Amino acid sequence: KIRKIVFTGGAAKGGNITPAAEFNIYADPEAAKIVFDSGIPLIMCGLDATLKCNLTRNQIMKLCQSGDPAARACGDMAGYVLENFSKYRCVASIHAAVPFMYLIHPEFFKTEKVFLDVECSDGAGRGATLCDFRWWLHEEDEMKDMILTDADTESFQQELFEAIYSVSECKNMK
């Protein structure tokens, strides 16, 4: 039995592919709707938190210049994100790491209980994640979903760096 699903995607306060929708949910809102309606408790790691889970240009350069192969590879990938997807090219958000970081260090994040849904109709709202914070409108067991609303950037960065450098340490232990 699946106890919960922790996923990267969605946004409570506006999207990145349209004003309303975040890319992952927008790409297939019907599939997201199936998951959202599954009854399995969801933890949404959306843009509200993932945009705060980033690396700075200087941190990325440090990774790229490292003698550690894992660090260099991570630096190259983050550098690609910085140059191609970061409008002002000062930070690169590391969206995909957030669910893992949340599972290991939930204390790095603020959360809020919500009722999640997704807009599947055509039009400007297609793919928008609907986060209903109005607990008084739902039965207690309906408010099973949570969203990450904020993140401790500094703690995220420090732990991510430690994890990246520990990859080579683990390899050397064999």
Q: Could you say what each language-model-derived stretch is?
A:
Residues 26-28, 45-174:
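Conformational coupling and interaction surfaces
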